[in-house]
Amino acid sequence: IGTLKRSDIRRYYNRLIDERNLKIATVDNIHTVLHQIIDLAVEDGYLRTNISDNALKELKQTRNLFTEKRMALTVPEQELFVEFLSKSPMYQHWFPIFSLMLGTGLRVGEATGLRWEDIDFENNTISVNHILVYFNHSKGGCYFGINSPKTRAGERTVPMIESVREALMQEKENQRLAGITCDVRVDGYTDFVFVNRFGNVQHQGTLNKALRRIIRDCNEEVLDKAKDNKPVVLLP
């Protein structure tokens, strides 16, 4: 490993795309794992620096693979989103996790990977120290895993505002009333905050599908109530 160079990493990523036809999202997952491994090599003195730093960014630059910049919701859009979720009988059970993500800025894997021990209700803080990921291997099957944040800045303590605190308390009460408990252990981690009715962790794909349906139905409701072609706020 001591003979590896930055060019070796770039060549490896290019080979994954050109010869194995992997998508950039898959290469991104591989980069996450590889970066952590090389970090360990640096700590043990086999390498002076992490030669995979910025390798994925450079790959995207050379192949023009940067996706369109995502825009944050405006305040009116946020208010519409929260109000619709809180009042919708069909989607109300999604309110706690989306409210938490909106009020903290946590990514999907950070939110779905939260454990109750990461929540400090006394000091109103949330510890973000790991990411829940989902691996899909043709030979090994599909399974969840736990990764460390991609950078040291990713490991952080987030203040818990009142709306997030209320959402978490609502989630705890909803699970108590429904008799739902966390019945899964992922890489030694358990007691996850957000679990489905089977006691398993939430899948990112499930959240994405739910979000698309929420946006569709919310916008349809707004348009149905609109009068005289007046401008309305819609979810993007």
Question: What residue ranges belong to the model's regions?
Answer:
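Arg/Lys-rich amphipathic alpha helix in sigma70-family domain 2
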Residues: 39-48, 170-173
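Short regulatory "switch" loops immediately downstream of catalytic or recognition motifs
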Residues: 15-17, 58-60, 83-86, 129-138, ...
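N-terminal core-binding DNA-recognition domain of tyrosine site-specific recombinases/integrases
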Residues: 1-44, 89-92, 201-207, 228-236
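Active-site/catalytic core of tyrosine-dependent DNA strand-transfer enzymes
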Residues: 74-79, 161-232
